[in-house]
Amino acid sequence: GRSRTSRPEHAFAELGETALIKRREEGVLGGWMPAVRKVMRCEGEPDSWYDVLVFADVRARDRFVVQTWHRTMKVKAGAIVAVHYTHSYPEFAPSRSAATAEQFYAALIDFAAYWQQALDGTVQAQLPDASWNDMAQFAFARELVVRPGGDYPKYGAVERDYYGNEYDGFQDTFTSSFYANLEWGRFAQAAAVLDNYFDEFVQDDGLPNMRGPEVGQFGLTLSLLARYLRYTGDAPRLRRLLPKIAATAQVLCALHDQALALPRTAHGYGLLHGWNESDACLFPDPSLWWKPYYANSALTIRGWEDIAQGWSTLGGDAGQATQWQRRAKQLRARLEASLRANVRRDLSPPYVGPLPGTKLTFRQSLLQEKTSEQQWPHRAYAELLQADVLPDDLAHLVIDCVRGHGGTSIGVVANIAPPEPGSRDLLGFISYGYAQQLLRLDRIEEYLLFVYAHRYQVHTRGSWTAGE
């Protein structure tokens, strides 16, 4: 319940005791609003506890400083025996006095009204357990908190790493936010995210204003732009961005041309080469990962096919759309042929690597090779499945390969690294493509395991904070 400006121990010194803190229960107000509530129970006193509530002052007009309201109270036998209110800072008598109950509850009413309006219109899933909706709503509320002005992207929050400006143009921050807001009916927020990203971070040549462009994410971006048009009919917004959208598609066309210029005997002939993971460019020799990862081609197919369908509606050149469709058909055939040719059926389950020509499984490669071209296979497999361009038998084979060769933990795609006996990682946001394919293939039990494991193992319970 503390912040960098106020501590609940100011009201009750015992709230600093480790034993009491370890017995805390956590949640958020109303099940989803970004107000943190913690209950700490006294050992041996089941009817006694401390209740802490903290939320941001939505009436504050500071540009960067976050003003906060705090309530710390002690309860015995169901009755409040002591309570302390604070607005942002400790008392500094006589100029700054303690907050009053009237001030606190007036601010709380304003806070609730603010967030109900901000999340108004968000789709509510029809589920027996309403807490799944709460979890989703809280995710959108948290996104609005993290994004300065509500639309400027941030990959992380608070701490220097990942909140630094060098991550602001991260393609995944755009695609995951844009996608989620579209699917949950938050079209106004999706439009705000779209405008900000293309105006601030997409250059005239189609590349993002960030290091390490990820090839697959260009394709996903095109697909999501087409989805936005289908869901909203907002062609004028996309027409304004037409030159940059065309440039994005051209980035992929240029990579495709390079792949087609390779010898037909090359493993990567006809498959898009390039970085699949942004971090690749930070290594001494980034060319190790300038490779024909299957995910690059899969999401490119998806992007070309989808954007071509709505290109004439946007006033785009019909010849361009026809060319993208032709390229997608050619690439789809090449992708399937390469995958089938690179299945290792001497292993059980059969193994297919994240790129053609691999001799080792991803686990073996990460253990035996100092730097492995199969690094970050979790992204490569998840994106390959997310694109939904594989025949069902190949999609099943890829999922079985990831599961059977140590690429999942509790049903969730692992953040795959060299294995060690003391730990297993679960992957955060990138893994959603894997889950989507489970659902499309009617692998319902595996999908449910994924969803529950992600909720209860990747996210902290109550406060819904997920690891990367």
Task: Place the predicted regions along the sequence by residue.
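Secondary-structure transition/capping motifs at alpha-helix termini
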Residues: 45, 75-76, 185-189, 200-205, ...
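Active-site core of glycosidic bond-cleaving carbohydrate-active enzymes
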Residues: 168-203, 239, 243-246, 250, ...
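Acidic/polar, glycine-enriched structural segments that form the non-catalytic walls/loops
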Residues: 21, 28-167, 235-237, 249-251, ...
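Active-site lining segments of carbohydrate-active enzymes
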Residues: 151-172, 207-211, 229-230, 236-290, ...
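Aromatic-lined carbohydrate-binding/catalytic grooves of carbohydrate-active enzymes
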Residues: 152, 193, 197-219
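Hydrophobic/aromatic-rich effector regions of fungal transcription factors
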Residues: 220-231
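Beta-strand-rich N-terminal accessory domains
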Residues: 1-18, 28-30
